[in-house]
A protein has these predicted regions:
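A conserved, positively charged/aromatic
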Residues: 6-7, 53-82, 97-98
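Short His-centered aromatic/hydrophobic patch
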Residues: 11-15, 33-39, 57
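A short, well-ordered alpha-helix in the C-terminal region of glycosyltransferases
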Residues: 265, 279-293
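Conserved acidic donor-binding segment of nucleotide-sugar-dependent glycosyltransferases
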Residues: 250-252, 256-263, 271-277
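A conserved mid-protein helix/loop that constitutes part of the nucleotide-sugar donor-binding site
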Residues: 136-159, 167, 176-183
Length: 311
């Protein structure tokens, strides 16, 4: 934690004058502040610019004293505030930090249609042979980090294997937990059923062939991977973690939700899915329809309306 705070301060110090120069010299009409937001907020408070500042709040921010103080005292200088989920928007409105009429829901830009078409038509034989080497599998995609909660996913799938001994789980991702997860799989004698695949830049062919995507995260925004999966007509099984999955899956009307990180909850959902797998098209269609709201074009249209006060 301390090292990340120090890195954050170093970035601010080295970026202060370059960003100030851009704002004074180039005078952009808008600037969207996202992730590393303290510096542009600080500059906006210290100087008068022609530029309109838009704050993008993602994830599920911890409202510590510093952040709450900074946001509340900067609100009058911020043009608009956008959030990627309606739950987060509602939460921030209740906290009464920003002026309500400045706050908007703005879905993430996740699906690039041109990129999707290119990747779905992948013709590299070595890669396609790798995809074809797996069959009738569940899929999980994302960095191998604490947030994604892979130890829970693996443990629950191992329980599922007691009922369905031929079950297959592919985990596509890289990260600091890879060795620990590999050892967890080995210790439970599940190396013939659970596979971790790294260095995969194109997940769409895997999504097109999978039975369902599983997301076990402890927290997410909407969860980019569930949007991509739904766009590929893949059924989604997700934890009900804050903040976005249950919103995207319409509280279980467009996919399966299970109680986040609760023992046996995912196992039960996998059992249920196996029993009724052929009868879930209505839920998949709803999720597919929802995913179309997250294209770059839809994001562009929504952002344009917000910036031009057309909402």
């Amino acid at each position: 934690y301390l090292s990340s705070r120090i890195s954050y301060l170093v970035i601010i110090l080295f970026s202060f004058f370059p960003l100030l120069n851009i704002l004074k010299k180039d005078k952009p009409e808008f600037i969207i502040m996202h992730l590393l937001t303290s510096l542009p907020i600080l500059l906006n408070n210290l100087f008068k610019f022609q530029t309109k500042f838009i704050l993008r709040i993602s994830g599920f921010p911890k409202l510590n004293m510093f952040r709450k103080f900074l946001w509340k005292n900067s609100s009058k200088n911020i043009f608009k505030i956008t959030c990627p989920t309606k739950d987060l928007l509602s939460y921030l409105k209740k906290e009464n930090i920003f002026e309500i009429d400045k706050m908007f829901y703005l879905q993430d830009a996740i699906i690039n249609i041109q990129d999707y078409i290119k990747k779905i038509k992948e013709n590299d034989k070595v890669f396609l042979d790798k995809v074809e080497s797996y069959d009738h599998y569940f899929l999980a995609v994302g960095r191998l980090t604490k947030q994604k909660n892979y130890p829970y996913l693996i443990s629950e799938f191992i329980n599922y294997l007691k009922i369905k001994k031929d079950g297959i789980l592919l985990i596509i991702g890289e990260g600091e937990e890879k060795n620990m997860l590999t050892e967890l799989i080995r210790k439970n004698n599940a190396s013939d059923n659970i596979f971790i695949l790294s260095n995969i830049s194109n997940v769409y062919p895997f999504m097109k062939k999978a039975r369902a995507l599983i997301l076990a995260s402890l927290w997410e925004e909407v969860g980019f991977v569930i949007v991509e999966a739904a766009f590929c007509n893949l059924f989604v099984i997700s934890s009900n973690c804050p903040n976005g999955p249950k919103e995207f899956l319409e509280n279980g009307e467009a996919g399966y939700l299970f109680h986040s990180n609760k023992k046996n909850e995912l196992t039960k959902k996998l059992q249920n899915f196996t029993e009724v797998e052929a009868n879930l098209n209505k839920l998949k269609i709803k999720a597919k329809k929802n995913s179309s709201n997250y294209t770059l074009f839809r994001h562009h249209l929504s952002l344009r309306k917000i910036l031009l006060n057309e909402n």
